[in-house]
């Protein structure tokens, strides 16, 4: 999820928008603990908004429409895709997922940080449009641990678990494309590392400038010229 293009702007959209809010992308293979970590982070940090994706997959036990996902039909998803409503979209394990562009840009324009739970393919799509989006890859401590977590979760049939484990290898190979990597062996440590990443991002010059532009101008501090 890295990009060789760098400039002094925070959350710089290729469509011309420069927003004070930061965009975080959390990527992980199924079973690595991504959702649990993200939920814990959100419960401690009210300044981050979770982007709720659209999906054509069936709800899992306990999932609610509009809270965990916007559950929709294949026909509706394709219509939204044709209308360019999605910032990114992908097919994962036979189901479609998409992220609302309008909602994200509105939140960031108003100074809110936005977090995406996303796969690596979607993260690359987002990075092409928001060059300073921050990619965070969650890794399991081992493939054996990943398999054990998938079994304990009790949500998938054995053949689905096998398919997820096979996919995990190719997904993990893209960890090098992220700006940050968190190894989720100890939950509390992994959560603390996520919090550190968020805090460090907010303190970057570009983020501080976008949030406090008038102060920086009054002090005579200006953005560096893009190369």
From Swiss-Prot:
It holds the Pfam family Guanylate_kin. One of its GO terms (cellular component) is cytosol. It catalyses: GMP + ATP = GDP + ADP. The gene is gmk. Keywords: ATP-binding, Cytoplasm, Kinase, Nucleotide-binding, Transferase. Essential for recycling GMP and indirectly, cGMP. One of its GO terms (molecular function) is guanylate kinase activity. CDD domains: GMPK. Coiled coil: none annotated. Its main location: cytoplasm. ATP binds at residues 28-35. This is Guanylate kinase. It comes from Burkholderia orbicola (strain AU 1054). The keyword Plastid does not apply.
